[in-house]
Amino acid sequence: MQGFGCGHCYSFRKMTSNTQPPTPAAIPAIAASHCAPAPSAWIVRFAHLLRPQGSVLDLACGMGRHTRFLSALNHALTSVDKAPEATRSVADIAETITADIENSAWPLTGRSFDGVVVTNYLWRPLWPLILASVKPGGVLLYETFAQGNEAYGKPSRPDFLLAPAELLQVCAGWNIVAYEHGLLHQPERVVQRIAAIRPGGPAAPAALLQA
């Protein structure tokens, strides 16, 4: 599982756009045409839940596949990762932070976002900070490896595998739009994933809550 290096590095280029937000139906085509490597199908499927042109935290962003995808949807990205080469790769389209969030101070204290995206990363002590980073009415899109993956390869340690229904327990009290735990292919892996809205904000239109 991905970790974080030490120190903090920040770079930011403010993005502005007069483009109208894409419709939910248009989002998969944007993902297919603008992003390589491809973003997670789960993130593409529920990106329409994010507030148009809203702020999004891409935590453990890796080489930025979701940063690029969400930037193409005109969101304002903050991308966090261990590797300087990873954050440098998206520094022209996002605020970037290189920080050791597992072993040093959380670099986003006092900040919250319209959406938080996390894929292929799990460090349970961060749960309270991740949840607090979502604004009331904001969206958490989370997908990572789960118990059962040990039959197919790494990660196989329980520390890095979600227990059955763990994301549902973590998001208890939130509006759960969708949840899955199962086997995916190409490559074969067992994942758990959730799309959840933090209570307290304006109600989302019913059409947006459809999977």
Feature map (PLM): residue ranges:
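Conserved beta-strand signature within the Rossmann-like core of class I S-adenosyl-L-methionine
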Residues: 138-146
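Conserved class I S-adenosyl-L-methionine
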Residues: 53-62
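S-adenosyl-L-methionine
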Residues: 15-51
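Class I SAM-dependent methyltransferase SAM/SAH-binding core
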Residues: 63-103
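Helix-to-beta-strand junctions that scaffold the AdoMet/dcAdoMet cofactor pocket
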Residues: 134-136
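Core SAM-dependent methyltransferase catalytic element
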Residues: 185-211
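A short acidic, Gly/Pro-enriched loop at the edge of an enzyme's catalytic core
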Residues: 106-115
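A short, conserved alpha-helix within the catalytic core of class I
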Residues: 122-132
